[in-house]
Amino acid sequence: MVISPSLSALHTLAHNARQAALHLGSLNTAERNQAIAAIADGLTAAMPEILAANQEDCAAAEAMGIAKPLYNRLLLGESKLKSTIAGVKDVEHLPDPLGQVTLHRQLDEGLVLKRVGCPLGVLGVIFEARPEALIQISSLAIKSGNAVILKGGREATRSCQVLTEVIQTALAKTVVSPEAINLLTTREEIRELLGLNQYVDLIIPRGSNEFVQYIQQNTQIPVLGHADGICHLYLDAQADLSKAIPITVDAKTQYPAACNAIETLLVHQAIAAEFLPPLAQALGEKGVSLRGDSGTQKLIDCEPATEADWCTEYSDLILSIKIVDSLEAAIDHINQYGSKHTDGIISEDLTAAEQFCQRVDSAGVYHNCSTRFADGFRYGFGAEVGISTQKMPPRGPVGLEGLVTYKYQLWGHGHIAATYTGQGAKAFTHLDL
Amino acid sequence: MVISPSLSALHTLAHNARQAALHLGSLNTAERNQAIAAIADGLTAAMPEILAANQEDCAAAEAMGIAKPLYNRLLLGESKLKSTIAGVKDVEHLPDPLGQVTLHRQLDEGLVLKRVGCPLGVLGVIFEARPEALIQISSLAIKSGNAVILKGGREATRSCQVLTEVIQTALAKTVVSPEAINLLTTREEIRELLGLNQYVDLIIPRGSNEFVQYIQQNTQIPVLGHADGICHLYLDAQADLSKAIPITVDAKTQYPAACNAIETLLVHQAIAAEFLPPLAQALGEKGVSLRGDSGTQKLIDCEPATEADWCTEYSDLILSIKIVDSLEAAIDHINQYGSKHTDGIISEDLTAAEQFCQRVDSAGVYHNCSTRFADGFRYGFGAEVGISTQKMPPRGPVGLEGLVTYKYQLWGHGHIAATYTGQGAKAFTHLDL
């Protein structure tokens, strides 16, 4: 493809990334795995250089007065780097997501249709402070035959630059083009990237709700991810208290900033008086602030919950509580206020659980367990690309299969459509092979 | 869900459609099939009424001076209506696309993950003149457990209104809510529909390229469809002339307005002098106008092709021809100018064919057969929802599986995430069942 000289540097970079992707996508499993092994080796050899660049990023961030949690995410110590490199080797050993034949059908004698797994092409991944994300994403991209254009957090610029150079140098010794892995460093480039429909096949944003929403609203490229994670737990009339308390505590407090932590607890009125006081005590011991509707306020000590609470992802040790008069009311509340992420029911009534799992319109519907299990690693996917709250697949926690698509191959021997139309039309055999 | 009185009628309609969808999605196969059978019966009983309304539409369109092809699409004669009703009965007998378990895994003892096929929710389908599309879409929607909001062509308003009433009346006698099938009648409602992200899960536009592009660019709701269909056929150095001629003629002339008809023929220079004259003669006999690059112009009588020709979907008996010096050049041309729809190679060289099928970045990659096979019915999908040229699945011709998604159900016995994290963390079993 000829690039006109008037096109921007990013345009050229994206064009070259697509060319690299077309080549990468035609490599076999061993060739892609060798490239991943070369990345692991290159990173291991360059550890001192990488850690030094990260130290510079950390020092600069500290001088700017960065918040402690962000600093911790930016900091790439030796043990974090080593375990990330070990993760690269894990990716090398994952099953190949490409080449799977999911349909193999004779349409007629000598005319055979195959649906074959193939890469998406070019991924645009925008992530925040954690520099090890660049390593993880690069190895997943190569495993799945995709080129990637990365944009890391501003604070991590030096780390990301060194990591990209090390990975590109490693790739240069393999059959994979170094142009398969690309780094953007300015915020302006994000907006331009979002307009490159002809080169970029999927955008994966990792960051705040507002950031993901901004991306979703400013691109025609498909976006894999989720803005909100407003998850619910519903304690049914037939809930078992000995399950309800530990699951509620786990779902709220085990990692409150996670998208799969609960924000609202729905409690059936039949058990509210019995359950809420011990629940409030258990949650209080973990430092959770409670906000309740009027019924809840009569039973336990809590702040009043307003309409806004039902729509809020606290990402913090805060829980809103509402008393509902039926399973139907719980389902309706979740379908209205939830973000289609993950919602659970605690009940010993299997019919109620089945109703809940069928009628709640979320990617994850859970019975008698914590919403915190909504995660690609916990599902056994090996690697997690993200969690999608869209309805169209891939939905929920997404592993490598979110980075691949398929194409239809049709192999004939001179077959033409006219043979199968009009008077005397030949019938298709449609015989699965 | 409570609807504020300030919301529009369409908002309320969409809200009610979503409620109907949640109920419809929880029905079993037999219940949904009974509703489809009731629709077929209702339509059969109401045939005189439907044909009369269609006659009115046709008379009004004729008075407005409607073009003949559009008139033919609008006209719903007795035989077309009967065969459409027969199609409804076919949908009744298709396999149920819902409820398939595509993953069933023990995460740990007593903690079982299932990925289960489920409906998308509410479909927005915007179609043109053909009133029978309303019947087809309604039956596919109910089969797949989805509600639908339909907008037909302006010319077909009377036909669509009667059809919708007949279908709703038929549904009222079943467990499916009549609110599952809805009709919009004004163009203004389309724009509002495109903004109803919270209710509508998928938009399926059927119409001109410009119309589909307009839809794609004006909604955050996923769109299933394709704007362009710029398909190619490449005659390789090792092409067999006895296959090349009939396949080229079929791919161009069998139905030139179809999206899977070819627009550009790429010819390897090694065979151009031998192949182009007989090809030009065969195409000329079918009334095809040829536009060639400079090399082509030296070999056959044709108009000059300009850069714009490589980007044009003629949808007519016009074919552009370009001579290329290698397989690589053919692949590059297709990846640059094609619309990722369907592209074919004619060659006796299997290595070249495999290279082509691997490196051409299209939903359909064909060897030694006509691109006209790109079609859900020909692929054996039973019913076609549309053809998608997006990279993310569903891609290519899409059957009922394009109207379904999945959710993850997790069934536990009090399991919490804390058990599996930190020191002394329990390992997951990840045992496929």
From Swiss-Prot, chains A, B:
Q: Which reaction does it catalyse?
A: L-glutamate 5-semialdehyde + phosphate + NADP(+) = L-glutamyl 5-phosphate + NADPH + H(+)
GO BP, sorted A to Z: L-proline biosynthetic process
Enzyme Commission designation: 1.2.1.41
Key words of the record? Amino-acid biosynthesis, Cytoplasm, NADP, Oxidoreductase, Proline biosynthesis
Compartments where located: Cytoplasm
Which N-terminal residues, if any, form the signal peptide? none
| Superkingdom of origin | Bacteria
InterPro entries referenced in this protein's UniProt entry, alphabetically: Ald_DH/histidinol_DH, Ald_DH_C, Ald_DH_N, Aldehyde_DH_dom, G-glutamylP_reductase_CS, Glu-5-SA_DH, GPR_dom
- Pathway stated in the Swiss-Prot or TrEMBL entry: Amino-acid biosynthesis; L-proline biosynthesis; L-glutamate 5-semialdehyde from L-glutamate: step 2/2
One Gene Ontology MF term: glutamate-5-semialdehyde dehydrogenase activity
| Cystine pairs | none
GO CC annotation terms, alphabetical: cytoplasm
Q: Which PROSITE patterns match?
A: PROA
Q: So what family is this one in?
A: Belongs to the gamma-glutamyl phosphate reductase family.
Entry function:
Catalyzes the NADPH-dependent reduction of L-glutamate 5-phosphate into L-glutamate 5-semialdehyde and phosphate. The product spontaneously undergoes cyclization to form 1-pyrroline-5-carboxylate.
Name the record gives this protein: Gamma-glutamyl phosphate reductase 1
